[in-house]
Design a protein with these regions (language model features):
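Intrinsic-disorder/low-complexity accessory segments
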Residues: 1-120, 124-151, 197, 203-204, ...
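Short, conserved secondary-structure transition motifs
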Residues: 145-164
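Active-site-proximal loop/turn and secondary-structure-junction residues that shape catalytic pockets
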Residues: 156-158, 233-235, 312
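Aromatic- and acidic-residue-enriched segments that line the glycan-binding/catalytic groove
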Residues: 162-178
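Aromatic- and acidic-residue-enriched carbohydrate-binding clefts of CAZyme catalytic domains
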Residues: 180-199
Length: 425
């Protein structure tokens, strides 16, 4: 089926003709082919050069030396005061200094795509989302940009996206074949799910052992976004999932208000998908438990993590129990979920900011009431392991102090400058 860029975009919106459409740079409309990471980067830099709504940065490189780019998207006024916005947000995490002025504080939405490289609708949707944010005109987009700072991470897994796009595009027929036994759907091992070292990056938000994760975590703590989205795919016979997940499988450390706010924004997802006639479900199939995943890590940091799962076309079109599932359709659903996230974040901006502030006040109060006031780390057996642990803790902004004198506890001697103290307050 032929489609145009309009297939993905809201109706009755005009666009700045000076902002290049994806097809002008990529050579195809999103969904006709799978975007490779090099083309994705090329388009994002082209957008940033053409638009005064976008700032782009490279936060490092993958093992295969692909850039880990991040787009900051907002109004010109907000972009000019990003450092000020960051400082005000950091104040909210200090229970002694948290009387912030919410009237002038935008909500921060971190939108991340395709941490599993062979779940490509997310990264391809990021292209459409970026174009809309850069080119749309009118009061609606102006209001959106004034009230939000969008951190757009178009590819959580550049090496995996590149690997999968190469396979799928190389095996695409001129006339797309939806037969599930077609070669296009049998990606060779190790596949695009993982990074260069075949590690599942959606398990690394806590261990932070890999460059992709380290860049993400640095961005997270620099901004501490109110919402972080994690766009995935699932089996081809499925429809579309958005959180909350299974209520009984939510981590007990996650506040109930977190799940209530997740459900509030879920109403916006439902409305958006209803408007285009797409099927969806929630509160089933997926948990919200392990904090080392992209959709749950924010939940223990005063943010709202949201998982999206789109039934995958795997290639360009695939026969399923529900009929032929085409790649552009999967992209469209991810785009709609991106729009609805932003719309919901604006509608509940003050609630998200209040929750963010109150979360850190609650954590501080809990620490004061706790019987354990400090932890002793290291000082014996394996100093190298101690240093490795300290590196992880430092990346998570956990304050550690070296012992200034020897301490003996439970028959063990913890030596000065070889052991460390982690205070709970």
């Amino acid at each position: 089926q032929n489609h145009s860029l309009d297939y993905f975009l809201p109706e009755d919106v005009s666009y700045n003709s000076e902002i290049p459409k994806p097809s002008k740079v990529l050579g195809f409309v999103p969904g006709d082919w799978h975007i490779s990471h090099d083309k994705l980067v090329q388009y994002m830099y082209t957008l940033a050069e053409a638009s005064d709504r976008i700032q782009i940065e490279n936060r490092g490189f993958t093992y295969e030396k692909r850039p880990l780019i991040l787009l900051s998207v907002s109004s010109q006024k907000n972009l000019a005061r990003l450092d000020e916005i960051k400082r005000k947000r950091q104040v909210l995490t200090d229970s002694q200094l948290n009387n912030a002025d919410f009237d002038n504080l935008p909500v921060v939405v971190n939108q991340g795509f395709s941490v599993h490289g062979n779940e490509p609708s997310g990264a391809n949707a990021a292209v459409v989302l970026a174009y809309y944010l850069a080119a749309a005109e009118g009061k609606s987009i102006e209001n959106l940009l004034n009230q939000t700072v969008i951190l757009l991470d178009p590819s959580f897994n550049p090496d995996g996206i590149q690997r999968f796009a190469h396979w799928t595009n190389s095996n695409r027929s001129t006339n797309v074949n939806p037969d599930p036994i077609d070669r296009e759907f049998y990606e060779t091992w190790p596949g695009g799910r993982t990074n260069h070292y075949w590690f599942d990056l959606n398990r690394d938000w806590l261990p932070v052992q890999l460059p992709e994760s380290q860049a993400r975590i640095k961005t997270f703590y620099e901004w501490r976004p109110n919402i972080l989205t994690d766009h995935h795919e699932m089996g081809s016979n499925s429809t579309f999932f958005f959180q909350p997940g299974i209520p009984q499988r939510t981590n007990p450390l996650t506040p109930k208000l977190n799940q209530d706010l997740t459900e509030k924004i879920g109403n916006f997802h439902a409305s958006a998908l209803d408007s285009i006639g797409s099927l969806y479900y929630s509160k089933e199939s997926f948990d919200d438990f392990y904090y080392g995943k992209g959709s749950t890590f924010p939940d223990v940091n005063g943010s709202i993590g949201i998982l999206f799962e789109q039934g995958s076309s795997r290639g360009h079109a695939r026969d399923t129990q529900n009929g032929v599932l085409r790649f552009p359709f999967t992209i469209r659903n991810q785009v709609e979920a991106s729009f609805s996230t932003i719309k919901g974040s604006i509608a509940h901006r003050v609630e998200f900011l209040e929750y963010f502030r109150d979360y850190y006040t609650m954590v501080s109060d809990e620490a004061k009431k706790a019987s354990t006031k400090a932890y002793l780390l290291g000082g014996h057996d394996d100093y190298t392991r101690t240093i490795a642990l300290l590196d992880v803790l430092h990346q998570h902004k956990v304050s550690i102090r070296p012992l200034t004198e020897n301490v003996e506890m439970q028959g063990k001697v913890f030596k000065a400058n070889e052991a460390f103290v982690l205070l709970t307050e």
